[in-house]
């Protein structure tokens, strides 16, 4: 990224020397025509043998045992949307409204469809160091705003809201370096080491919770594969590709509202 906040991703995508693999089917459908024969759809996976070997090395640690757990960021500390400066009441109200509506819908991300030219222009004026992608036919301003800015904000709002609701009713444990002071009652045990501690959390938690980032439109995030590879039980938000690979109610459970 240059000092002007511009990146030329189109040349990287269309370069005949590059091969790109995407785990999100909808993203693949958008990008594949830009470089036929060089862009592929490939779901993620996990190294089950490695995960099981990490679990086998377990030395009992009560910090890594939980009834209901979530591992990951709340996105509160890295949300570019929060840099929005002095938006008008109408812009703020419109953005708050569409984000609130999206929070209630799983399996379909409609924010980009609701960003008019006027809203896009107003947003750009209020966003310092706006991330513009040079000469990109598919990453338009509306796509950037909906995915990079608003998508991250919705993910943050969703995670904080769900953690608040769950911690009021159940012993909720979170493994994160995010600030959880706004969530009373939650048990924040800090971050975990990806290769040594995280497999134990997934294996020994009674219920593992997955909340997919809104930037992943249809694909299955790595977190789901890792939890299942550790022999853990997972409840996830609904993603369109989940039923293509798993039997809901047998391999995995999902929530939709």
What is the role of each PLM region?
Residues 1-134:
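Catalytic core of nucleotide-activated saccharide and alditol-phosphate transferases
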Residues 6-8, 12-14, 29-37, 41-42, ...:
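Catalytic binding pocket for nucleotide-activated donors in carbohydrate/polymer assembly enzymes
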Residues 27, 158-162, 201:
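Alpha-helical packing segments of well-folded alpha/beta enzyme cores
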Residues 49-59, 156-157, 191-196:
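A Trp-anchored, charged/polar loop motif used as the substrate-binding/catalytic surface
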Residues 68, 166, 227:
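Conserved hydrophobic/aromatic pocket- or pore-lining residues that grip, position, or stack substrates
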Residues 80-87, 147-152, 188-189:
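Short, flexible/disordered intra-domain loops and linkers
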Residues 94, 165, 169, 245:
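Residues that form generic nucleotide/phosphate-binding pockets
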Residues 122-169, 175:
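Alpha-helix-centered segments that form part of catalytic cores
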